[in-house]
Amino acid sequence: MADMPSGESCTSPLELFNSIATQGELVRSLKAGNAPKDEIDSAVKMLLSLKMSYKAAMGEEYKAGCPPGNPTAGRNCDSDATKASEDFVDPWTVRTSSAKGIDYDKLIVQFGSSKIDKELINRIERATGQRPHRFLRRGIFFSHRDMNQILDAYENKKPFYLYTGRGPSSEAMHLGHLVPFIFTKWLQDVFNVPLVIQMSDDEKYLWKDLTLEQAYSYTVENAKDIIACGFDINKTFIFSDLEYMGQSPGFYRNVVKIQKHVTFNQVKGIFGFTDSDCIGKISFPAVQAAPSFSNSFPKIFRDRTDIQCLIPCAIDQDPYFRMTRDVAPRIGHPKPALLHSTFFPALQGAQTKMSASDPNSSIFLTDTAKQIKSKVNKHAFSGGRDTVEEHRQFGGNCEVDVSFMYLTFFLEDDDRLEQIRKDYTSGAMLTGELKKTLIDVLQPLIAEHQARRKAVTEETVKEFMTPRQLSFHFQCFCFDT
């Protein structure tokens, strides 16, 4: 077994912190497996060396579960003051100093949204007659805007539709990208409503070093993964901005209306644009806003302007739709309603979300069973203790343990999840056992997704992406054919 790299080779305090955590897990596993004494001694020596390097770099002792935030200042790992100053969320950046991740209660206050409480979850269950999705039960979708209006419409047999999207920046999607689509699929099933999915390949062309052809090819590849989530082809329209803008005058007209009613000062304040940003970036928010208005899709909704949409998305997309909600009544449309999700953490910890640009921070939908096992074992941040003895005595910290966080997303059984939480917190379950549980959940989940994706043909993609009339059964949707 290869030694961990020395502290001097780490390029940042966070990397050094993660190296200590990984080396600590190695020491625990060697002791638990009754490895030869010289091998254990060598691993312990490396662990002590890493901790000394950390202290030299940070000016303080390594503390399990408290990754470095400010490398030059003394800090209390989870103090409110630190969290308030370090939490940062916009459509491109998610950052916090807390190992527990973003303080979502504070984000609700900051963004001015409403918490999804037990009363709202119960109302969704009554309206649909279905058990709430685990993402609702566990607070993964935690915030909303005007969800009660959507339920009012549904209960009164009035129409609404779903809108979500994907910015295709690479061929392979990762686990975090699945979250809004898994939930949107459930919403489509229980409410039996049409869905539009925007592929913002124009956005990725503007922000990334891509050609137009690359951006569109990523749209097609990502669409296959989205289709593999099981969406109903008779109720789902997937569209590329680069393609659909030229096919739908109604869509472009809404873009222009939005552009006229939002000033540069407004978008600069909302999105942080600077004088050096290209004009395409400055105008793009109007493109993401336009699908919120039903007459952007005349093949589906004809010229109706009064049909509200519900947008399931990660909370970092909310700035786009705060702008949209401000504009909507001024151009004759209802405000879109929203359901916000938490972020899917990187393997290295909840300080940031999973990123497709860092292969070691992400589990991709193309990963093999072997790659999944290796990534979880090597890179998933642990809330465990430095030694087996300490872990048995004091237990692990589920609030910072990435493997447990991932199980809250993908393990359906509530009772089993609660038992895992109790066992890990009490010390009855070790980090290696928790990681094995996660691996056993993820490997079949991704293998099944890969099998469904393999069955998606180019013809299927074309059918999903062709503008057409969709099938739905609300009384108010009874158009003449």
Curated annotation (Swiss-Prot):
The modification Phosphoserine is found at residue 355. Proteolytic cleavage generates 2 forms; T1-TrpRS and T2-TrpRS. SUPFAM superfamilies: Nucleotidylyl transferase, S15/NS1 RNA-binding domain. Signal peptide: none annotated. CDD domains: TrpRS_core (cd00806), WEPRS_RNA (cd00936). A motif ('HIGH' region) lies at residues 168-177. One of its GO terms (molecular function) is tryptophan-tRNA ligase activity. It catalyses: tRNA(Trp) + L-tryptophan + ATP = L-tryptophyl-tRNA(Trp) + AMP + diphosphate + H(+). It is found in: Cytoplasm. GO terms for biological process: angiogenesis; positive regulation of gene expression; positive regulation of protein-containing complex assembly; regulation of angiogenesis; tryptophanyl-tRNA aminoacylation. A motif ('KMSKS' region) lies at residues 353-357. Its EC number is 6.1.1.2. Isoform 2 is widely expressed, isoform 1 is found only in embryonic stem cells. The modification N6-succinyllysine is found at residue 158. Residues 12-68 form the WHEP-TRS domain. GO terms for cellular component: cytosol; nucleus; protein-containing complex. Keywords: Aminoacyl-tRNA synthetase, Angiogenesis, ATP-binding, Cytoplasm, Ligase, Nucleotide-binding, Phosphoprotein, Protein biosynthesis. InterPro entries: aa-tRNA-synth_I_CS, aa-tRNA-synth_Ic, Rossmann-like_a/b/a_fold, Trp-tRNA-ligase, uS15_NS1_RNA-bd_sf, WHEP-TRS_dom. Homodimer. Interacts with oxidized form of GAPDH. Catalyzes the attachment of tryptophan to tRNA(Trp) in a two-step reaction: tryptophan is first activated by ATP to form Trp-AMP and then transferred to the acceptor end of the tRNA(Trp). Could also possess an angiostatic activity. NCBIfam families: trpS. This is Tryptophan--tRNA ligase, cytoplasmic. It comes from Mus musculus. The lineage of its organism: Eukaryota, Metazoa, Chordata, Craniata, Vertebrata.
